[in-house]
């Protein structure tokens, strides 16, 4: 596992904490160097056990580069709170961030369909049972990659602190300070115009129920 050199106390070595962050987010930034040019592409991902699944068009430059063997790193970030301190200098944010690096494996035809089903089930559990399976043309246009979560290939950083005290910040003690929690919620689904008369399927209902809506 990689190690933090600055603020090492924020480094977390618990694999369960890494999985919790990865499972709580949907978007990461895939970074690599292709033909001497740095690329950073925000994209959806899904954790499947000890690997992360990525997919996109076979025409995507960044994915073609990593599929050809370029080293890559996926960064995932969750903003948990604004830290409002007695001074602007001491104000910050609480967050969790992870990097997972390593070689990406291009999934073959036999694995691609199953991986895409897994990807869909992570994002919208139950949806694959409500729609048709991808056809041969769609699968041929899709590049599916797997990034292993190796013991020596990930880093997790967690900032979870109260603001500095007035004494620590050299500030007056009559200035409010505290935390403003940040969270992502799933609102009520909005049907497409051509589906307005159709019932909301169980998979979509489950998304809002699990979010507390």
Predicted regions and their residues:
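Short, structured beta-strand-loop surface elements
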Residues: 59-118
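General beta-strand recognition
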Residues: 51-53, 73, 155
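C-terminal edge-of-domain segments
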Residues: 111-213
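Short helix-to-loop capping/linker segments positioned immediately adjacent to catalytic or ligand/cofactor-binding
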Residues: 29, 33, 86, 104-107, ...
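A generic structural signal for short beta-strands and their flanking turns/coil linkers
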Residues: 26, 41, 48-50, 68-72, ...
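Well-ordered beta-strand positions
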Residues: 44-46, 67, 138, 148
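An N-terminal domain-cap segment
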Residues: 1-54, 64
């Amino acid at each position: 596992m990689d190690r933090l050199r600055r603020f090492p106390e924020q480094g977390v070595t618990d694999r369960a904490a890494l999985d919790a962050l990865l499972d709580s987010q949907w978007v990461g930034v895939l970074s690599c160097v292709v033909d001497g040019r740095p690329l950073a592409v925000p994209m959806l991902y899904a954790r499947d056990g000890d690997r992360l699944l990525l997919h996109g068009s076979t025409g995507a430059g960044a994915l073609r580069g990593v599929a050809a063997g370029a080293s890559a790193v996926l960064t995932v970030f969750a903003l948990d709170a604004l830290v409002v301190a007695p001074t602007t200098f001491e104000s910050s944010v609480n967050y969790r961030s992870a990097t997972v690096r390593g070689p990406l494996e291009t999934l073959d035809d036999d694995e691609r369909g199953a991986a895409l089903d897994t990807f869909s089930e992570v994002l919208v559990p139950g949806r694959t049972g409500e729609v048709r399976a991808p056809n041969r043309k769609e699968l041929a246009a899709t590049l599916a990659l797997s990034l292993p979560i190796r013991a020596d290939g990930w880093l997790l950083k967690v900032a979870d602190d109260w603001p500095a005290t007035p004494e620590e910040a050299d500030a007056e003690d009559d200035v409010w300070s505290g935390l403003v929690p940040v969270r992502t919620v799933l609102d009520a689904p909005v049907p497409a115009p051509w589906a307005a008369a159709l019932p909301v399927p169980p998979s979509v209902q489950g998304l809002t129920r699990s979010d507390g809506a």
